[in-house]
C-alpha cells in the first residue's frame, strides 16, 4: 500500500512538471504584424520631449491601429535610454511582431510632422498619416491634450533634467497602469490613486505632468491588448531586479513598481501557503488535506522550475498560471482563508468567497486562528531563551486581549458568502467604548422605552478589526453548512425588518439588538448603563470610527 501512495505522490508532482518544454525553445512561427518603432539618436531634450508628446497622442488617437499604438508604447518606454537603438532590441525577442526601426531627426516646427532620417523606411504618405493621427484625439480628451494642464505640451524643454523629470512623470503613470492591466483592469482606480500619491510624495512624479484619467485608461487598454508590449515590459522588470543599490532613477522606479506587478494573479496560491502552511497549526494533519498538500508541493516545485519569469505569469499570459488556481486545492484554500480573515485585516479587501469555498473548512480556519493566536512556537522560544513562566505570560496576555475584543462570545459564524462591507460590524471594539446608538430612522412604535426591567442588551459576538461576522443565515444551504459548528446561531431572531445602525455612512452596519425575550426591537443600552432612545431628534455621537481605510 505504501508503494501505491508513493507512486501517487510522484505522479501528482510529475503531472505538473512533465508538460514543460525546454528552456528557450522557439514556438512555431505565426503571422506577425509590422510595428514601426521610432528611434532618436541624439540626446536633444527638445526633440525627445516632442517625441514623448507625439507617442502619447498616437496612443490616445481614436483612429490609430493596434500596430501604431504598440510602436508608440515601445518608443515611449525607450525614451530615457541613451541608446534607443540598442534598447529597443529587447522587443525583438518577441515572437509576436516584426519590429521596424525608423530613425527620426525631429519634427517640423509647430507640428507633429516627422522629419525622418535618410535611413528611415517611411514614405511621405505614412508621415502625413502619423501627423493626422496625432491631431485626431477623441472627444473624451479635454482641451485637445492628454495632460490635465493644457499648457504642458507647449512648454519649452531645453535641458536634460527637465526632459527626464517630465518623461519619468509620464512613464511612472504608465507603469502604474501595468499593475492592474491583466487582473483587475475594470476595477475602481483607488489603488492607482494611492500609488500616484506615494510617488508624488517621493518626488518621482510631478503633479503638473499628470495625464487625464481617460488618457491613462487608453494607455492601460493598449498595454492589455498587446502581448509584444507586455513581453518588452517583462524584460525591463527583469533588468530592474538585477540592478544593485547604485542604480539610475528610471530602473529604481521600475524596480519599485515591479513589486506591485510580481506574482499578480497568484494571490490565492501565496495566501494559501502563508496562512495554511506558514502557521503550521494542527488542522493540517487532517486526512482531507493530504492530497491537496501534495498538490501544493508540486506547485511550489513548478514555480521554482519556471525560473525568473514565474513572477510575471499573468503579464505574459502564460498557460501555467491556470495550474495555480485555487480550484485545484479548495479545502486547504478554504481553511487558509478562514485563518487569514482573523489574522490579517487586509484580507477584507480580497474576494475569497469563491463558488468552491467550503464553509466547514473556512470555519475550522476561523476557530483555529482564534484559539491558536496565543500559542508559543517552542523553537523560537528556545532561541529567545524564554522560561516556562514567560511563555505562560505571553499566552495569557494574548488570550486576555482576545477576550477583551470579544473573541469567543457566541453569536454566529463568520459568513464568507457575504461581502465584507455588507457584514455587520462590531458594536464595540473595547470594553471601555460604549455601544452605538440605535438608528434614527428605525420606525419603532415603542416610544423609546429601554429594555424591560432595566435589562442590559443581550451579549452578542464582538470582534476586533480582523473579525468578519455573519448576518442571519437566509440561505438554507449556508445554514446547513454552518449549523453544526455553531448551534447557537439558531437563537438569533430572523426578522425581515432588522434594525440597522449606520457607522460613518450607508455601507457600515452595526449589530442588531433585541430585548431579553427576543421578540421585539427595543432601545439599545450601552455598556455603562446609558440608554439610547429611538428619538430622531437625539443623535448621540459614536466613538467608533470607520472600518474602511
From Swiss-Prot:
Pfam families: Paramyxo_ncap (PF00973). Keywords: Capsid protein, Helical capsid protein, Host cytoplasm, Phosphoprotein, Ribonucleoprotein, RNA-binding, Viral nucleoprotein, Virion. The keyword Glycosyltransferase does not apply. Residues 531-549 have a biased composition (Polar residues). InterPro entries: Paramyx_ncap. It is found in: Virion; Host cytoplasm. Residues 437-447 have a biased composition (Acidic residues). The modification Phosphoserine is found at residue 439. GO terms for cellular component: helical viral capsid; host cell cytoplasm; ribonucleoprotein complex; viral nucleocapsid. The keyword Chaperone does not apply. Residues 437-469, 517-549 are annotated as: Disordered. One of its GO terms (molecular function) is structural molecule activity. Forms the helical nucleocapsid (NC) with 12.71 N subunits per helical turn and a rise of 5.3 Angstrom per N subunit, protecting the genome from nucleases. The encapsidated genomic RNA serves as template for transcription and replication; encapsidation by N is coupled to RNA synthesis. Forms the encapsidation complex with the phosphoprotein protein P. Before encapsidation, the newly synthesized free N protein, so-called N0, is chaperoned by P. Belongs to the paramyxoviruses nucleocapsid family. Homomultimer; forms the nucleocapsid. Binds to the viral genomic RNA. N0 interacts with the phosphoprotein (via N-terminus); this interaction allows P to chaperon N0 to avoid N polymerization before encapsidation. Interacts (via N-terminus) as N-RNA template with the phosphoprotein (via C-terminus); this interaction positions the polymerase on the template. Ncore is globular and carries the regions required for self-assembly and RNA-binding. Ntail is an intrinsically disordered monomeric domain in the C-terminus. This is Nucleoprotein. It comes from Mumps virus genotype N (strain L-Zagreb vaccine).
Amino acid at each position: 500500500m505504501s508503494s501505491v501512495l508513493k507512486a501517487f505522490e510522484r505522479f501528482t508532482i510529475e503531472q505538473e512538471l512533465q508538460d514543460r518544454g525546454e528552456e528557450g525553445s522557439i514556438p512555431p512561427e505565426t503571422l506577425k504584424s509590422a510595428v514601426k518603432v521610432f528611434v532618436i539618436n541624439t540626446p536633444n531634450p527638445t526633440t525627445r520631449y516632442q517625441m514623448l508628446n507625439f507617442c502619447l497622442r498616437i496612443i490616445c488617437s481614436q483612429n490609430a491601429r493596434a500596430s501604431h499604438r504598440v510602436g508608440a508604447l515601445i518608443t515611449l518606454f525607450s525614451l530615457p535610454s541613451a541608446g534607443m537603438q540598442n534598447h529597443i532590441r529587447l522587443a525583438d525577442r518577441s515572437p509576436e511582431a516584426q519590429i521596424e526601426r525608423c530613425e527620426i531627426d525631429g519634427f517640423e516646427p509647430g507640428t507633429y510632422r516627422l522629419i525622418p532620417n535618410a535611413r528611415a523606411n517611411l514614405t511621405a504618405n505614412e508621415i502625413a498619416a502619423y501627423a493626422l493621427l496625432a491631431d485626431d484625439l477623441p472627444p473624451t480628451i479635454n482641451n485637445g491634450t492628454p495632460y490635465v494642464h493644457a499648457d504642458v505640451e507647449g512648454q519649452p524643454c531645453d535641458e536634460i533634467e527637465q526632459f527626464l523629470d517630465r518623461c519619468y512623470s509620464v512613464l511612472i503613470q504608465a507603469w502604474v497602469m501595468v499593475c492592474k492591466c491583466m487582473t483587475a483592469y475594470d476595477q475602481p482606480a483607488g489603488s492607482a490613486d494611492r500609488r500616484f500619491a506615494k510617488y508624488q510624495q517621493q518626488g518621482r512624479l510631478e503633479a503638473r505632468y499628470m495625464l487625464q484619467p481617460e488618457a491613462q485608461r487608453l494607455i492601460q487598454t493598449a498595454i492589455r491588448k498587446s502581448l509584444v508590449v507586455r513581453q518588452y515590459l517583462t524584460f525591463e522588470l527583469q533588468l530592474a531586479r538585477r540592478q544593485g543599490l547604485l542604480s539610475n532613477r528610471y530602473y529604481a522606479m521600475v524596480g519599485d513598481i515591479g513589486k506591485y506587478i510580481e506574482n499578480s494573479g497568484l494571490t490565492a496560491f501565496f495566501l494559501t501557503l502563508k496562512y495554511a502552511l506558514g502557521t503550521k497549526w494542527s488542522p493540517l494533519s487532517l486526512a482531507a488535506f493530504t492530497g491537496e498538500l501534495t498538490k501544493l508541493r508540486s506547485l511550489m516545485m513548478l514555480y521554482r522550475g519556471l525560473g525568473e519569469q514565474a513572477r510575471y505569469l499573468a503579464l505574459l499570459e502564460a498557460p501555467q498560471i491556470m495550474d495555480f488556481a485555487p480550484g485545484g486545492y479548495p479545502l486547504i484554500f478554504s481553511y487558509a482563508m478562514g485563518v487569514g480573515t482573523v489574522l490579517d485585516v487586509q484580507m477584507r479587501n480580497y474576494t475569497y468567497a469563491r463558488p468552491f469555498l467550503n464553509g466547514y473548512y473556512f470555519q475550522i480556519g476561523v476557530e483555529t486562528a482564534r484559539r491558536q493566536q496565543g500559542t508559543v512556537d517552542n523553537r523560537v522560544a528556545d532561541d529567545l531563551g524564554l522560561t516556562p513562566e514567560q511563555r505562560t505570560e505571553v499566552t495569557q496576555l494574548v488570550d486576555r486581549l482576545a477576550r477583551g475584543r470579544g473573541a469567543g462570545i457566541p453569536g454566529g459564524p463568520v459568513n464568507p458568502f457575504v461581502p465584507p462591507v455588507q457584514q455587520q460590524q462590531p458594536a464595540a471594539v473595547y470594553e471601555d467604548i460604549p455601544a452605538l446608538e440605535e438608528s434614527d430612522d428605525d420606525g419603532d412604535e415603542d416610544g423609546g422605552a429601554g429594555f424591560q426591567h432595566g435589562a442590559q442588551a443581550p451579549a452578542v459576538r464582538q470582534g476586533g478589526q480582523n473579525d468578519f461576522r455573519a448576518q442571519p443565515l437566509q440561505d438554507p444551504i449556508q445554514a446547513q453548512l454552518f449549523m453544526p459548528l455553531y448551534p447557537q446561531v439558531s437563537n438569533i431572531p430572523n426578522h425581515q425588518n432588522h434594525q440597522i445602525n449606520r457607522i460613518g455612512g450607508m455601507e457600515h452596519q452595526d449589530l442588531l439588538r433585541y430585548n431579553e425575550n427576543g421578540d421585539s426591537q427595543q432601545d439599545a443600552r450601552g455598556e455603562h448603563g446609558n440608554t439610547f432612545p429611538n428619538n430622531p431628534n437625539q443623535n448621540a455621537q459614536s466613538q467608533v470610527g470607520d472600518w474602511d481605510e
